[in-house]
UniProtKB/Swiss-Prot annotation:
The modification N-acetylmethionine is found at residue 1. Keywords: Acetylation, Polyamine biosynthesis, Spermidine biosynthesis, Transferase. The keyword Aminoacyl-tRNA synthetase does not apply. It comes from Homo sapiens (Human). This is Spermidine synthase. Residues 18-253 form the PABS domain.
Length: 302
């Protein structure tokens, strides 16, 4: 069963043929990623989406939502560490953090490591993803045991409407802009996050891939610049995401913020204590250095 030209990815066991999971999607037409499957571990349709977990030959357990890979045990750390530490290390004192999405627990795991973080609220609309992750991705879901966490199973939009001027950092760990997640890439969502942030607050959102979605990234950057005095785009590498890269849109309400230089640089001792495998202060700085085609597109340089 192949998706149509404008359709979603093939989901569930239908995406597994002859021992291989194959990811295709209209958001990255003309290309596919395949992983060899050792065992199908879980398949169920929740109220919101199709949830598939399989054990792969080389990437460990893999979580797939609506036919699109969300994380694998082998490479998830790069994305989780970056989407958490880029904003946290760009804020002078991030005590209260809000996570939208991130049901697999990876972002939460990284956020609660920070000693300055006193409380974390996570809004995840699909409780089934949380339960599946606790069972099949325990190394990611470990953060759910943190005493810093308040878990809110429900709509992040409604939660932020009721909690304004409340958070130092907001992190949105969303899936790709299809279906319900499409609204998380709109100006109205960023405006809502702005009102939920404190006066010097910082946000970081999943920002798609510069090789595939440059027009969308440019559009997002433009409306972010109309809302925030400081906006920056960064990226990291991750093998099982489309084209091997994923980006991050960062915004600050504080005009003196310099995302390219961490205000709280981690020492190598802290990196070791936090068991980081991708992020360090040099990687932080390098993440904002874009290839020329992306730099030109995002900065309107002719």
């Amino acid at each position: 069963m192949e998706p149509g030209p404008d359709g979603p990815a093939a989901s569930g066991p239908a995406a597994i043929r002859e021992g291989w999971f194959r990811e295709t999607c209209s958001l990255w037409p003309g290309q596919a990623l395949s992983l060899q499957v050792e065992q199908l571990l879980h398949h169920r349709r929740s109220r919101y989406q199709d949830i598939l977990v399989f054990r792969s030959k080389t990437y460990g357990n893999v979580l797939v939502l609506d036919g699109v890979i969300q994380c694998t045990e082998r490479d998830e750390f790069s994305y989780q560490e970056m989407i958490a530490n880029l904003p946290l290390c760009s804020h002078p004192n991030p005590r209260k953090v809000l996570i939208i999405g991130g049901g697999d627990g990876g972002v939460l795991r990284e956020v609660v490591k920070h000693p300055s973080v006193e409380s974390v609220v996570q809004c995840e609309i699909d409780e089934d993803v949380i339960q599946v992750s606790k069972k099949f991705l325990p190394g990611m879901a470990i953060g759910y045991s943190s005493s810093k966490l308040t878990l809110h199973v429900g709509d992040g939009f409604e939660f932020m409407k009721q909690n304004q001027d409340a958070f130092d950092v907001i992190i949105t760990d969303s899936s790709d802009p299809m279906g319900p997640a499409e609204s998380l890439f709109k100006e109205s969502y960023y405006q809502l996050m702005k009102t939920a942030l404190k006066e010097d607050g910082v946000l970081c959102c999943q920002g798609e891939c510069q090789w595939l979605h440059l027009d969308l990234i440019k559009e997002m950057r433009q409306f972010c610049q109309s809302l925030f005095p400081v906006v920056a785009y960064a990226y990291c590498t991750i093998p099982t995401y489309p084209s091997g890269q994923i980006g991050f849109m960062l915004c600050s309400k504080n005009p003196s913020t310099n995302f390219q230089e961490p205000v709280q640089p981690l020492t190598q001792q802290q990196v070791a204590q936090m068991q980081l495998k991708y992020y360090n202060s040099d990687v932080h700085r390098a993440a904002f250095v874009l290839p020329e085609f992306a730099r030109k597109a995002l900065n309107d340089v002719s």
